[in-house]
From Swiss-Prot:
This is Hepatocyte nuclear factor 1-alpha-B. The lineage of its organism: Eukaryota, Metazoa, Chordata, Craniata, Vertebrata. The keyword DNA-binding applies. Keywords: Activator, DNA-binding, Homeobox, Nucleus, Transcription, Transcription regulation. Binds DNA as dimer. Forms a homodimer or heterodimer with HNF1-alpha-A. Potentially also form a heterodimer with HNF1-beta. PROSITE patterns: HNF_P1, HOMEOBOX_1, HOMEOBOX_2, POU_4. Residues 54-78, 284-329, 511-533 are annotated as: Disordered. Residues 1-31 are annotated as: Dimerization. GO terms for molecular function: DNA-binding transcription factor activity, RNA polymerase II-specific; RNA polymerase II cis-regulatory region sequence-specific DNA binding. Pfam families: HNF-1_N, HNF-1A_C, HNF-1B_C. It is found in: Nucleus.
């Protein structure tokens, strides 16, 4: 039997059982339908209300309404609801009928009547705002009374019940005279002085929403014919919910379902679904970016990070942070500078010609290169930096298979280079060495040839040499040509780890101008290191770089060593006469 009852009927039956009526009493009342005539008598029929013989009082009803302490309010005892004054404008028969029904409801259990009123509002999709506008009750007080059974004064309950009775008559007339005016004579706007009634907004009922959700799962963009079929189905469900015939659908009034409303519902549902999807994706992407930050310790073995280039104005801020965010979406395959065994810390570069990496070299024992050894991870923001030195160039002189080496990078521009302090976990860059004057291009050619021949000894250095060409990666940029004739050795940066930091920080800078005489001649195209003083190391050109003298003088910053050079002979040595041998053996240092 329960399956044949509607949702509203099940709620009413449950309310009867909760009110104290037992199943046996309910069955007996249904069997004795003639004696219990009140539920079967329409509220607009006043024939049996005046007699009072056929009206059965509920067991927990109140014989004489009494106002409790909780029912006291600021309105006072002489509060008269506006709707009660409107009863005087009705005909004597209608006024007597409505007053009799209201008095009868006042004798019922307030909580039970409140449930009936709430069920009626839900059945006909009537908002509580309409009750508030008509009766003058407080919105919060009315909601608490209908939902929680909060006590309400007798005068206010009489106003609520008067509206309830009048609304029943109004809706009954709407379905009886479908297609006519939806406002009755006794409840018209003109009958309520100084009160502007608002038209009720359309509200989807639960029956119609269930039909539309099922249709949305089948087809998110229904055609006009499908929407019209849904209109008929929804109106039919709304009429059955109200207990009237589907042929009286025009009596739904403002709750009548139309094709335009169905179209708007599908459009709004699609927008809501798209918004929920976007919100879920944004939340997921935010969690992914916060849960997986890229750092030197998080980089997997065998992966090569790539870096992006910022503007020159942002280079200082990026270097101050010592690391910049690595954006996978902005990476370019042409920026892969290291092999699979190398790892770098990403640091943003400038908008200059090709930006290479200044990185420490691997030790001879590659098997000891693990993820925990992060001392050989570094990248510097230098334009056209060239890393010199390979595993084969280290030679057998380094018996300690450490993974840290001393690297000197050669820049192609005479400009201020930001210095990174404390990059990674144990690496530090020192002050860059500035050359105030550039070598003439005619001097550069022999040196470039020697460096290129040296770097071609291994695949890594060959790749570095190829990437150093400003036309290899930046052929589409017109401003590359202005950097091709720049000096080759204008700047040098020294990289080391914390084990060698104490030695290098003890060096103090000084300046000395060494003249290049045009009458000097030599056969070896290189430079020789001399130790003029036991505490000063400087570069002195003992051989001419080219037959044509074009450079008159150059300046070099020298570093004074506070300790004896014998203790740190692995840093610089005056025993090499050519730049080739100097590059291959002396531009690297193993951490002790």
């Amino acid at each position: 039997m329960a399956s044949q009852l509607s949702y509203l009927q099940q709620e009413l039956l449950r309310a009867l059982l909760e009110s104290g009526v037992t199943k046996e009493a309910l069955k007996k009342a249904l069997a004795d339908g003639d004696n219990y005539a009140y539920p079967n008598v329409p509220l607009d029929d006043i024939r049996n209300l005046d007699e009072g013989d056929n009206c059965v009082q509920l067991p927990n009803g109140l014989g004489e309404p009494q106002m409790s302490e909780d029912e006291s309010s600021d309105d006072g005892g002489d509060f008269t609801p506006p709707i009660m004054k409107e009863l005087e404008r009705l005909s004597p028969e209608e006024a007597a009928h409505q007053k009799a029904v209201v008095e009868r409801l006042l004798q019922e259990d307030p909580w039970h009547v409140a449930k009936l009123v709430k069920s009626y509002l839900q059945q006909h999709n009537i908002p509580q705002r309409e009750v508030v506008d008509t009766t003058g009750l407080n919105q919060s007080h009315l909601s608490q009374h209908l939902n929680k059974g909060t006590p309400m004064k007798t005068q206010k309950r009489a106003a609520l019940y008067a509206w309830y009775v009048g609304k029943q008559r109004e809706i009954a007339r709407q379905f009886t005279h479908a297609g006519h005016s939806m406002i009755t004579d006794d409840m018209s706007c003109d009958d309520v002085p100084n009160k502007k009634m608002r038209r009720n907004r359309f509200k989807w009922g639960p029956a119609s929403q269930q039909i539309l959700f099922q249709a949305y799962e089948r087809q998110k963009n229904p055609s006009k014919e499908e929407r019209e079929a849904l209109v008929e189905e929804c109106n039919r469900a709304e009429c059955l919910q109200r207990g009237v015939s589907p042929s009286q659908a025009q009596g739904l009034g403002s709750n009548l379902v139309t094709e335009v409303r169905v179209y708007n519902w599908f459009a709004n549902s699609g927008k809501e679904e798209a918004f929920r999807h976007k919100l879920a994706m944004d939340t997921y992407n935010g969690q992914q970016s916060s849960a997986q930050p890229l750092s030197t310790h998080d980089l997997p073995h065998g992966k090569t990070p790539r870096y992006t280039q910022d503007s020159s104005t942002d280079r200082s801020a990026a270097m101050a942070n010592s690391q910049s965010t690595l954006s996978p979406s902005a990476l370019e395959p042409s920026h892969i500078l290291m092999n699979s065994d190398s790892k770098m810390v990403p640091v943003s570069g400038g908008s200059l010609p090709p930006v290479s990496t200044l990185t420490a070299l691997h030790s001879l024992d590659h098997s000891q290169h693990t993820l925990g050894q992060t001392q050989n991870l570094i990248m510097a923001s230098l334009p056209s930096v060239m890393t010199i030195g390979t595993d084969s160039a280290l030679g057998p002189a380094f018996s300690n298979p450490g993974s840290s080496t001393l690297v000197i990078g050669l820049a192609s521009q005479t400009q201020s280079v930001p210095v990174i302090n404390s990059v990674g976990s144990s690496l530090t860059t020192l002050q860059s060495v500035q050359f105030s004057q550039q070598l003439h291009p005619s001097h550069q050619q022999p040196i470039v040839q020697q460096v290129q021949s040296h770097m071609a000894q291994s695949p890594f250095m060959a790749t570095m040499a190829q990437l150093q060409s400003p036309h290899a990666l930046y052929s589409h940029k017109p401003e590359v040509a202005q950097y091709t004739s720049a000096g080759f050795f204008p700047q040098t940066m020294v990289i080391t780890d914390t084990s060698n930091l104490g030695t290098l920080t003890s060096l103090t800078p000084s300046k000395q101008v060494v003249s290049h005489h045009p009458t000097a001649h030599g056969d070896s195209p290189g430079s020789q290191l001399h130790n003029q003083d036991s505490s000063i190391l400087h570069l002195h050109p003992s051989h001419r770089l080219s037959p044509i003298p074009t450079v008159s003088s150059a300046s070099l910053i020298h570093y004074h060593n506070s300790s004896s050079p014998e203790n740190h002979s692995h840093l610089l040595s005056p025993s090499h006469n050519t730049i080739d041998s100097f590059i291959s053996t002396q531009m690297a240092s193993s951490s002790q």
